[in-house]
Amino acid sequence: MAFMRSHSNASSGMGVAPDIRDTFLELQMKKAFRYVIFKIEEKQKQVVVEKTGATTESYDDFLASLPENDCRYALYDFDFVTGENVQKSKIFFIAWSPSTSRIRAKMLYSTSKDRIKQELDGFHYEIQATDPTEVDLEVLRERAH
């Protein structure tokens, strides 16, 4: 019996587009992107890659990519230097669900979160955010150290 990754049902939320895992591996292993934004395409009944951010883009560029009134999932590759002067990188999974987004969108993203997280196995930290203060750069710094 073949298993289709993009298959979805009411209890598990949306399916996941086949290229999501490859995009994650490009961020994780090849450092091809600074961040990836994912959105739910209701007509396709799956989570898809909406945008990738170049490694030269800033954290402000990433935040500007999150819609003010709609939900998204995101990965952010956070580079930092430890107290011992060692360069490190941690990948954050962010479930962005602003309080101003539609209730239906919040429900769809909530029920689909576990499914996309299965495809993104290997991120270090998860943040659930409802407003910009919850994804401030300081929040990432504190979690990464």
Curated annotation (Swiss-Prot):
Stated name of the protein: Actin-depolymerizing factor 2
Family to which this protein belongs: Belongs to the actin-binding proteins ADF family.
InterPro entries per record: ADF-H, ADF-H/Gelsolin-like_dom_sf, ADF/Cofilin
Organism whose genome encodes this protein: Oryza sativa subsp. japonica (Rice)
GO terms assigned for molecular function: actin filament binding
PROSITE patterns per the UniProt record, alphabetical: ADF_H
Designated gene of the protein: ADF2
Annotated Gene Ontology cellular component terms: actin cytoskeleton; cytoplasm
Pfam (any one): Cofilin_ADF
Free-text function comment from the UniProt entry: Actin-depolymerizing protein. Severs actin filaments (F-actin) and binds to actin monomers.
Metal-binding as UniProt keyword: no
Keywords: Actin-binding
One GO BP: actin filament depolymerization
SMART domains tied to this protein: ADF
Domain ADF-H: 13-145
PANTHER family (alphabetical): COFILIN-RELATED
CDD domains assigned to the protein according to its UniProt record, in alphabetical order: ADF_cofilin_like
